[in-house]
Amino acid sequence: MDPRPVRTLSLCTGIGGLDLGTDLALGGRCRPIALVEREAFAAAHLASAMEAGIMAPAPIHADLATFPAQSLAGSVDLILGGYPCQPFSQIGFRHGTHDPRHLWPHILRILRTTNAPLAFFENVRGHLTLGFDQVLADLADLGFDAEWTVLPASAVGATHRRDRLFILAYRPSQLTTLGDTLLPRLEGLTRHGDHPPFGQEPSGPPAPPSLPLFPPAPLNHDGWDRWLRLHPDTQPSIRRGPYGIPDRVDRLRALGNAVVPLQAAVAFRTLTTRALGATP
């Protein structure tokens, strides 16, 4: 029997990088119940992605502070959240909990109200030295354990570094029973990355093919020449855009706040494997 769909609630969604990555890690089984995103440009991009079939359709709410989480109590398997990094980043002056963009208390309220067993968050590396201890304490108060890691986008082949902190929060009493649902095996691999025993058929979603996932570095002219010959129609869904484009600033801000989907997928698989291994 195929694992059941995973019902997700996405907070501070941005342009959906964390959502796409988690869906990739779970074999395309994420079923969003709702998304919360206040930026009009990002919300419009999400709606466009839904219309194009890139993301599953779901209502998009604009205000995290007034989101009616009580209506979803007991109906959410996994909460996703890329809560604002500016309170913890150097470029945002690291005002921490005093920053008006500090939205963690609202996410904590939603986590408590929905009683979701699992959450996956993303933030900047600087969060480790500002505010992270409070996040862990708040999660512990709700009965969560946590695993975390810092993973650069370059680790999955991107041409930029972009270190990101990924946090997996889980209720130990529930994670074991959800293990087969939340960590499906890739075809040909066991949960720990080994091949299955001789004579045993592989199961689960197919493993991703060995294909180039990113274009060459900006100054790799020979690489770009080969890439464009092989992929003449390649266009990213959101591009920086030249000067003179009215929404150029919105695009840059959206990209600056985004996470590479494959980066999120690798982090989710890594942390879930680690959590399951630590669960008695």
Predicted stretch roles:
Residues M1, G277-P280:
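Short intrinsically disordered terminal tails
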Residues M1-V6, A73-G74:
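Short helix-loop-beta connector
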Residues V6-A65:
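SAM cofactor-binding core of SAM-dependent methyltransferases
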Residues L20-L24, S48, R109-R112, A137, ...:
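Short, well-ordered alpha-helices that flank and scaffold nucleotide-derived cofactor binding pockets
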Residues L35, H61, L80, F120-F121:
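Generic enzyme active-site microenvironment
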Residues H61-D77, R269-T272:
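Short amphipathic alpha-helices and their capping/turn segments at secondary-structure boundaries
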Residues F67-V76, Y83-R253:
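Class I S-adenosyl-L-methionine
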